[in-house]
A protein has these predicted regions:
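Terminal targeting signals and extreme-terminal segments of soluble enzymes
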Residues: 1-139
């Protein structure tokens, strides 16, 4: 099954990362790269919301993790794992909002990448995060 960004009113130049069932169930999530910096997007659906009708914090954290890992692996089909993730919620987001992630690679080592991101809804920051991501060796 092909998952298309246009089906979620997301620009066509975004790509779907194939193979992560959890991300597809929560999102689906989409990405593009500006150099080595990821730009990510997902459209909030009803199943992403909590009892307050705002996006569940766990959904935002999962999307932040996706954004951070896209920066670490450079959008390639590389396996990575999150070693640590810190996040701060700054504002709510709601059903039908387009959540856009802007990631930044802070430092890239041989096996660890330090990354940060901000998530936006309606041009307002809703979450800030930073992480250490480990690059896994190819088998």
């Amino acid at each position: 099954m092909t998952i298309s960004p246009e089906d979620y009113d997301i620009p066509a130049h975004y790509k779907h990362w194939v193979g992560d069932k959890a991300e597809d169930h929560i999102g689906p999530f989409f990405f593009t790269l500006e150099g080595e910096h990821p730009r990510t997007a997902f459209r909030v659906q009803e199943h992403n919301c909590n009892a307050h009708d705002s996006v569940h914090g766990g959904v935002l954290m999962a999307f932040a993790d996706y954004t951070l890992c896209m920066g670490a692996n450079g959008g390639e089909n590389e396996s990575v794992i999150t070693v640590s993730l810190n996040s701060e919620f700054t504002a709510p987001a709601f059903k039908d909002d387009l959540i856009v992630g802007k990631g930044k690679v802070v430092r890239r080592g041989k096996s660890m990448v330090f990354v940060s991101c901000e998530l936006f809804a309606n041009e307002q920051v809703v979450l800030m995060a930073s992480a250490v991501v480990k690059l896994l060796k190819k088998r």
